[in-house]
Amino acid sequence: MQILPKVNTLRKGSLLYRGIRYRKGFGVHSPFVFNLITKVIEEKCSYYSFYDIELLRKQLLFREGEITYPDRQNKGKRKTRSIGEIVKRESIRPKHGALLFRLTNYFKSKNILQIGTTMGLSTLYLTSYATGLRCIALENLPEFA
């Protein structure tokens, strides 16, 4: 009975060691995955458009007005929240938005389909790396569109 918990502990420890060892991409055999990890995921430099998008986020956070939309948990009920609260709760975080920007910049996407934009900040991150992109953003709730 005592051997099983030790085996699980050793297994978790080895998985943790592998995660730490290969975190920066070293030890990954695939050149594609190595470049993706080192040049996209682990890159820390700030790009030119991040400042503009975060300035727009701050403007939306302090914007007056409320939006009434259907509640996800309680079917049939409606919620009323301020625009700032919706941006704070539902929009993409700056860290994840920067990752979206770096991914689209790395793959040089020309056509982008986004489902569920919620105020459009993630759409800005996806499309701000170049001009002349074709982006189709679908939003289920007309209040957020």
Regions found by a protein language model. Give the residues of each.
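A short alpha-helical cap/connector motif
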Residues: 1-145
